[in-house]
């Protein structure tokens, strides 16, 4: 069993090496809440290694329907500041609300997601402002189809006088 252990984050390391050969961007997606802390840990651990420390073509997704997304962003900002190289952060609202709610209830755990859409929307807008205020450490990318949320992001960018090209608006085609 021990011989099968390739070290923490070996799959991400492999992807980063291949991406570098092809000048490709890697964005680490976030899926279920029970894997969130592990995903963040591996992301930070791998990008803190000397081989990957210089990489600024890597990002991670933060789901703003999670109640602890704000504290995750603070920790990510503090880590990126210490690292000295910014990372991209794609803010999304989240797509697994039903699963996260049902899974937590079935296990008797606290529900990790906001229970009302307006709470998720409000948190998304709070986190837009946080990431934009910290754009020298967290490169903002906003993944949404919601016109109000995107308009809010553009208004905050204008208010904060964000430099051109310092943030992105992203969306899935076909939605």
Task: Report each predicted region and the residues it spans.
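Positively charged, amphipathic and often flexible ligand-engagement surfaces
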Residues: 1-175
């Amino acid at each position: 069993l021990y011989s099968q252990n390739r070290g923490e984050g070996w799959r991400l390391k492999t992807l980063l090496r291949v991406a570098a050969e092809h000048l490709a961007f890697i964005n680490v997606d976030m899926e279920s809440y029970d894997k969130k802390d592990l995903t963040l840990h591996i992301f930070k651990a791998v990008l803190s290694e000397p081989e990957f420390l210089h990489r600024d073509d890597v990002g991670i997704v933060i789901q703003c329907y999670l109640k602890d997304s704000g504290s995750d962003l603070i920790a990510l900002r503090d880590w990126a500041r210490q690292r000295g190289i910014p990372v991209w952060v794609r803010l999304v609202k989240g797509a697994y609300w039903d699963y996260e709610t049902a899974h937590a209830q079935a296990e008797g755990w606290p529900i990790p997601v906001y229970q009302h859409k307006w709470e998720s929307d409000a948190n998304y807008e709070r986190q837009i402002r946080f990431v934009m205020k910290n754009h020298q450490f967290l490169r903002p990318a906003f993944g949404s189809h919601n016109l109000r949320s995107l308009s809010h992001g553009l208004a905050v960018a204008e208010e904060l006088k964000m430099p051109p090209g310092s943030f992105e608006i992203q969306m899935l085609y076909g939605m």
